[in-house]
Amino acid sequence: VDGTWMTELKVTIQGELFKHLLIHCVLPYSNWEWGRVAQSESLSAVRLGLQSSLCKLGYVPEWVQTDNSSAATRRLGVAEEGEEGKTRGYTVGYLQLLEHYGLKAQSTHVGNPNENGDVESQNGGLKQAVKQHLLLRGSREFARIDEYEAFLFAVMEKRNRSRQERLAEEIAVMKPVTATPLATSIEKKVRVSSGSLIQVQRRSYSVPTSLIKKEVTV
């Protein structure tokens, strides 16, 4: 599973450039792929992308490999060799997600993102396919995000048609999905500061001054 930025495709939603990425899941043998649109590589986005892919596939692989994004891993310390030697461990939320589906975690080594080569290669291939389908469509403008996402689904469906033979070999050794999907969003209560700001996942957001010192749900 990997988050790949798609903003370079210059897709617009109601005339505005849509800055977004795709949480992209790929099976390494068949190259079967699926993904969901997100606007940051957060744990919620990874949860949405992974769960949607598992539900679409209908089966659960043994392992899930990811890079060292902050959605899945956190820094544990710095090794003697310096910056590239930083070690990372999995976040609690990511491990809980995998445990829910009976998956094992595997990540690339810090400084070696090319170890996630299968999905990285498919990222480029999918972007090229989307570019071609946008040209055939004659427009990069969409009325809504879900309309654009449906367009992406159709592109991935088409690419997956030629992968069915190898896919059958992969799912033959997998277990069916039996777990109920987890919620893809998390509600949290926070108090508005005297400066009319709230802190959510280490980021500050401005809210109306009428909410100062009040507790709000985000």
Named regions from a protein language model:
Residues 1-33, 44-45, 188-199:
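Mobile-element integrase/transposase regions
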Residues 18-19, 35-63, 82-87:
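Active-site beta-loop-alpha junctions of metal-dependent nucleic acid enzymes
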Residues 59-86, 110:
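Acidic/histidine-rich, metal-coordinating catalytic segments
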Residues 66-67, 84-85, 96, 105-128, ...:
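RNase H-like two-metal-ion nuclease catalytic core shared by retroviral integrases
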Residues 74-79, 117-121, 169-172:
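Short acidic, glycine/serine/threonine-rich loops at helix termini
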Residues 87-103, 127-138:
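Acidic, His- and aromatic-enriched active-site or binding-groove loops in soluble protein domains
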Residues 123-217:
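Active-site-proximal acidic segments at structured loop/helix or strand boundaries
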